[in-house]
Curated annotation (Swiss-Prot):
The keyword Lipoprotein applies. A bacterial surface lipoprotein that binds host (human) complement factor H (fH, gene CFH), binding contributes to the avoidance of complement-mediated lysis by N.meningitidis. Binding of fH to the bacteria surface is independent of bacterial sialic acid moieties. fH binding affinity is high enough that it may sequester plasma fH, depleting its circulating levels and de-regulating complement in the host. This protein induces high levels of bactericidal antibodies in mice. It comes from the Bacteria. The record marks 223 as: Important for antibody recognition. SUPFAM superfamilies: OMPA-like. A lipid is attached at residue 20 (S-diacylglycerol cysteine). PROSITE patterns: PROKAR_LIPOPROTEIN. It is found in: Cell outer membrane; Secreted; Extracellular vesicle, Bacterial extracellular vesicle. Protein is lipidated in N.meningitidis upon growth in radioactive palmitic acid, probably on Cys-20. This is Factor H binding protein. GO terms for cellular component: bacterial extracellular vesicle; cell outer membrane. It comes from Neisseria meningitidis serogroup B (strain ATCC BAA-335 / MC58).
Length: 274
């Protein structure tokens, strides 16, 4: 089988696998026409919420990310924009994906599965629920391997220099991981102290329901307000978390957590608003 045919077969496999695996775990998913529109429609400034998301970490240089939904397809490269204005706020939007790399003029499939987007009014994050990867060390064929990771976290960043000077704000939203988007995030920021802390609850695995230890708000290299701290389970450090603050008035947070468990490191997407 030539590589071109192999890539087409991989997309078909991704569609079948994702159709079988989607919708579990009580996930609030976007299944409306907006999925196809996100791939085909031009940007419309009348759309509500964050209108576009630059795919930076989701697609590396020299790679291609092919997304499909409801009969529509589109291929993205590093730095391309996804039309998130067509997606529903505060829900997981699900696309089938294949990730490919070009070698000697040929596209080779690296992995396939489900590409997820969680959008708020001022921020969004992407995640990959991989179902198959290329067995590069042995057969070179696609083999089943389920894994979950976070891609991009982006939006309308809050400048560190424009944070509220005082007061406290509590953010409530979602925490989601592999086959489980039923988690809840609660995070409180003390703007006077420039510090935040919170917790993740209601995920299926008890060891993923963790405390997000108090951590300072700091400026990153672009002067965006960000928070990085430790994850605690039964008061023991079990990983780390990072959050960006988004919106002109610090209305939202979005980020991720990495939790060490008996089955390895688990990745969790985080998003919440005041």
């Amino acid at each position: 089988m030539n590589r071109t045919a192999f890539c087409c077969l991989s997309l078909t496999t991704a569609l079948i696998l994702t159709a079988c695996s989607s919708g579990g775990g009580g996930v609030a998913a976007d299944i409306g026409a907006g999925l196809a529109d996100a791939l085909t429609a031009p940007l419309d400034h009348k759309d509500k919420g964050l209108q576009s998301l630059t795919l930076d970490q989701s697609v590396r240089k020299n790679e291609k990310l092919k997304l499909a939904a409801q009969g529509a397809e589109k291929t993205y490269g590093n730095g391309d924009s996804l039309n998130t204005g067509k997606l529903k706020n505060d829900k997981v939007s699900r696309f089938d994906f294949i990730r490919q790399i070009e070698v000697d003029g040929q596209l080779i499939t690296l992995e396939s599965g489900e590409f997820q987007v969680y959008k708020q009014s001022h921020s969004a994050l992407t995640a990959f629920q991989t179902e198959q990867i290329q067995d590069s060390e042995h057969s070179g064929k696609m083999v089943a391997k389920r894994q979950f990771r976070i891609g991009d976290i982006a939006g309308e960043h809050t400048s560190f220099d424009k944070l509220p000077e005082g007061g406290r704000a509590t953010y409530r939203g979602t925490a989601f991981g592999s086959d489980d988007a039923g988690g809840k995030l609660t995070y409180t920021i003390d703007f006077a102290a420039k510090q935040g802390n919170g917790k993740i609850e209601h995920l299926k695995s008890p060891e993923l329901n963790v405390d997000l230890a108090a951590a300072d708000i700091k400026p990153d290299g672009k002067r965006h307000a960000v928070i990085s701290g430790s994850v605690l389970y039964n008061q023991a450090e079990k990983g780390s978390y990072s959050l960006g603050i988004f919106g002109g008035k610090a209305q939202e947070v979005a980020g991720s957590a990495e939790v060490k468990t008996v089955n390895g490191i688990r990745h969790i997407g985080l998003a919440a608003k005041q």
